[in-house]
């Protein structure tokens, strides 16, 4: 089974950097498993065009995490640029957008992302949990479930593509030869036969 590592984009206010770092820590097992890779603007290297890098990664991420605080809602760039672009990709089915409520915020339920399922569980802000680690575990578990769904859809898509390839005439013809040719003769000619039929297929 093969799948593409899930790209996660962090959309957050720099004033909330400590929250982002804590969340990254709680997602470290997913990273160790090779399931995800992170991107946030602190990864932009000296000399890079920061806006171009943000746009590039925001437009390719499988999952966009919105780290919701009053700082996030007050940031024109977070709200008007990153969040709105993330929601556009969500509407097109290109990305999964997950709002994470970090602190109590007045009015977030009137925002475009209010229609989405938020984390932690029941939308209780991370800072309102008795144990903050419990809150981040709840968030990480929710993100893991989303990742598993995306990987499942990737696997199903790959299986469908393979099936479609196998149903093409060149592959059917090779299958017929495999069934009727003596084992030793076929083994000696297998590579040439496959290449011959692949060349026919590629020319179509």
Where do the protein language model's features map onto the residues?
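Defense-system signaling and execution modules centered on TIR/cGAS-STING-like, death/scaffold domains
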Residues: 1-11, 33, 52-60, 119-120, ...
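Cross-kingdom TIR/SEFIR domain
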Residues: 7, 15-150
């Amino acid at each position: 089974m093969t799948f593409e590592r899930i790209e996660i984009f962090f959309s957050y206010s720099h004033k909330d950097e400590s929250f982002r770092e804590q969340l990254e820590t709680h997602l470290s097992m997913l990273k160790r498993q090779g399931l995800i890779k992170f991107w946030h603007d602190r990864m932009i290297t000296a000399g890079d065009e920061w806006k171009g890098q943000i746009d590039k990664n925001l437009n390719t991420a499988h999952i966009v995490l919105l780290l919701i605080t009053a700082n996030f809602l007050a940031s024109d760039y977070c709200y008007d640029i990153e969040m709105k672009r993330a929601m556009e990709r969500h509407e097109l089915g290109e990305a999964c957008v997950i709002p994470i409520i970090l602190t109590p915020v007045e009015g977030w339920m009137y925002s475009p992302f209010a229609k989405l399922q938020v984390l932690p569980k029941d939308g209780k802000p991370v800072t309102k949990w008795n144990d903050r680690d419990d809150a981040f575990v709840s968030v990480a578990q929710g993100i893991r479930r989303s990742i598993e769904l995306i990987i499942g859809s990737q696997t199903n898509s790959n299986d469908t593509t393979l099936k479609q390839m196998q149903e093409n005439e060149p592959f059917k013809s090779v299958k017929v030869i495999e069934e009727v040719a003596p084992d030793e003769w076929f083994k000696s000619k297998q590579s040439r036969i496959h290449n011959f039929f692949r060349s026919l297929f590629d020319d179509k």
